[in-house]
Amino acid sequence: MHITIFRTLYKHVIDHDLIERMLKRNNIAFEKTGYDAGSRYKIISDTEEAMVSFKKRLREVYPQIPLSA
C-alpha cells in the first residue's frame, strides 16, 4: 500500500474536479479536506504503478504542486 499527502492552493488549482477524476482514473482512493487557502489530499493506492502514473500526470498539469518522489 502506498500513501501520499499533498496540498493544493486555490490560487494555483482552479479545477479540483480534474485532480479527483485523475485519481479515480488511476483507481486511487483519496480523502479530501478543505481549508481556507486550498485543499489537502490523502491518497492511497495498492500499486506503485498507479501512484507513479498519477504523480507524473499531476506534475504535467500542475507543476507547482509539491509531491514527494
Question: Where would I find each of the regions flagged by the language model?
Answer:
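Conserved short beta-strand edge segments in small beta-sheet-based binding/regulatory domains
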Residues: 31-33, 59-69
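Short, surface-exposed ligand-recognition loops at beta-strand->loop->(often short) alpha-helix junctions
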Residues: 3-15, 47
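A general secondary-structure signal for short beta-strands and their flanking turns/coil
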Residues: 1-3, 38
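Charge-rich, low-aromatic oligomerization/scaffolding segments with amphipathic character
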Residues: 50-62
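Acidic, low-complexity, intrinsically disordered interaction modules
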Residues: 16-51
